[in-house]
Amino acid sequence: MKPQKSLRARAMDILSRQEVSRIGLKRKLAPHAESEEELENVLNEFAERNWQSDLRYAEAYIRSKSRKHGSLRLKQALAQQGIDEKTSRNLLPDRSSEKQAAIAVLRKKFKHPAANLKEKQKQARFLAYRGFDADTVQTALKHAWDENWEDSC
């Protein structure tokens, strides 16, 4: 029979694999904690030693997802993980990067421009689902198949 891992060792294992927000780490450790106080002590220690950082988590999350998702979806996902809006707003990609990402996502999913209104609405819904705002969706639909537009960004 294996000996039980300490809460501190479990936290170290989790953080050695990937960046995790404080709320995410708390959720993963909670079933193994004997008390709320013990859990908070471990979380505070890891934050003080900078082993767990919400800022690093947000940077890594945005870096990995920003090519596929828009600012609205990224902001919402970070808020669910307990990252405050000010932090997430500072890390989000700028407007031109987001428009280029929307165009890339649109071109990958749909190989040709919309032939009719129904197809255009389908493409707009797809981009909106991915978290792109209305302005970005309209720009992407308008310029996705313009070869010269990317150079002007």
Curated annotation (Swiss-Prot):
Keyword Cytoplasm: yes
Disulfide bonds: none
Annotated localization: Cytoplasm
A single cellular component GO annotation: cytoplasm
Any single biological process term in GO: negative regulation of ATP-dependent activity
Sorted UniProt keywords: Cytoplasm
Pfam entry (one): RecX_HTH2
Alphabetical list of InterPro entries matching this protein: RecX_HTH_2nd (IPR053924), RecX_HTH_3rd (IPR053925), Regulatory_RecX (IPR003783), WH-like_DNA-bd_sf (IPR036388)
NCBIfam families hit by this protein: PRK00117.2-5
Family per similarity comment: Belongs to the RecX family.
Chain's role: Modulates RecA activity.
UniProt name for this protein: Regulatory protein RecX
Gene source species: Neisseria gonorrhoeae (strain ATCC 700825 / FA 1090)
